[in-house]
Regions:
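Conserved NTPase motor "head" modules and their coupling/switch loops across ABC/AAA+ ATPases, GTPases
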Residues: 1-31, 172-302, 311, 315, ...
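Conserved lysine of the Walker
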Residues: 35-36
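Helix-to-loop junction immediately C-terminal to a conserved catalytic motif
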Residues: 44
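Nucleotide-state sensing region of NTPase/ATPase domains
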Residues: 47-125, 129-131, 140-143, 147, ...
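Structural recognition of the conserved hydrophobic beta-strand(s) that form the central parallel beta-sheet
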Residues: 72, 328-335
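A conserved P-loop NTPase coupling/switch region
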Residues: 106-114, 118-183, 359-360
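Walker B catalytic acidic pair
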Residues: 306-308
């Protein structure tokens, strides 16, 4: 699998952009705030319908314009796919595959798999539980079409339940309708908890090997899934918390409050680990994501690497670059020295200056 080309129109700081990409490594270099990350964001958005930064659609449309367009040409199993995405202010985004509009993000499943790796990902260990849930969900949504649909349904139900909890203060008669949302929330929540639990077991098999290699065998990494409540007790917990939820006007229990605990040699490194340990563990998790996707789809995902090398020491740079040698990779950076010193093969180089992309001679 690889991306053949990308076109942008009125996206972020790009008036218009057309790029043909190499199947191997594509480097985008330039000073900060020139638009390098915007290219990766556009590709990830087009392939998943989500911004890796959680940006709103209207914020990605170029200032002063009413709409934006992204086109991505993908080659997979000798088949070609054209993915078009239209963003319009105050309207839902439109996505089409080979000219046919799709209604759900899950219809992109099986067309392109993207792994985004940014400096923020290196803080996944020390940041709050929301970041670790996001890591889980981004991975599972690319691997399991049913999970993607179930998660969307669950989030919708929680949002509707929270809205109802707020409305109860002025319309107490609506209380009986909570039963409907509670039953549906428990149904979809159990599915999510079970899928997350299964995935963590598979993740541990991979992450232990990678982390062992990264640390020279000095550390054994273990990821522990910490559900807010078990699948078996979810419905009863929701029921038991109802009065509390009505006072707080929000849903206090469920998989939207799950967390992960990352242990190195039996020690919780979020609390007791050094920054170096936390970053190495985060790198192990992201590399595991790549290997699991490869194994599941029996193909290589496309890696979007946003200025991560500058955050790693030389040995971890080497390990990362060796790990991605057979994957189409788009890398942003401020210079080429790291790649030259590691004698890393580069297939195409692009210079980015204030929203203009060129290939140096």
């Amino acid at each position: 699998m690889y991306i053949e080309s990308v076109q942008l129109k009125n996206f972020r700081n790009y008036d218009s952009l057309e790029l043909d990409l190499a199947q191997g490594t594509n480097i985008f270099y330039g000073n900060n705030a020139q638009g390098k990350t915007n290219i990766l964001e556009a590709l990830y958005l087009c392939g998943t319908t989500k911004s890796h930064k959680g940006s709103r659609d209207k914020d990605m449309i170029q200032f002063g314009k009413d709409e934006s367009h992204i086109r991505m040409m993908v080659k997979r199993d000798e088949l070609s796919y054209r993915i078009d995405m239209h963003l319009k202010k105050n309207k839902a985004k439109g996505v089409a595959i080979n000219g046919l509009p799709i209604r759900k993000a899950s219809e992109l499943f099986g067309v392109v798999n993207l792994v985004f790796f940014s400096p923020e990902d290196l803080n996944i260990i020390k940041n709050g539980p929301g970041e670790r849930r996001r890591f889980l969900d981004l991975e599972l949504c690319q691997l399991d079409k049913i999970y993607l649909t179930d998660l969307a349904s669950y989030n919708h139900i929680v949002n509707q339940r929270n809205k109802l909890l707020k409305d109860l203060s002025v319309q107490p008669s609506l209380k009986d309708t909570l039963d409907i949302w509670d039953i549906q929330m428990a149904e979809y929540g159990r599915k999510i908890i079970d899928k997350r639990s299964e995935f963590i077991k598979e993740l541990n098999e991979t992450v232990r090997k990678i982390h062992g290699n990264l640390t020279g065998g000095l550390e054994e990494l273990n990821v522990i899934y910490e559900p807010d409540c078990t699948a078996e007790k979810l419905e009863s917990t929701i029921c038991a918390n109802r009065e509390r939820d009505m006072r707080m006007r929000l849903t206090s229990a469920g998989p939207h409050r799950d967390d992960l605990c990352v242990m190195a040699n039996g020690i919780d490194i979020r609390t007791y680990g050094s920054q170096g340990q936390q970053r190495t563990a985060a790198l192990s998790l992201k590399l595991s994501e790549i290997y699991i996707v490869k194994r599941k789809i029996k193909d290589t995902p496309v890696l979007l690497l946003d200025d991560v090398l500058s955050e790693l020491d030389s040995s971890r740079q080497n390990y990362l670059l060796d790990s991605i040698s057979d994957i189409q990779t788009l890398i942003t950076c401020t210079g080429l020295d790291d790649f030259i010193s590691h004698q890393f093969q580069i297939n195409k180089v692009f210079q980015v200056v204030q929203g203009t992309v060129s290939q140096p001679v």
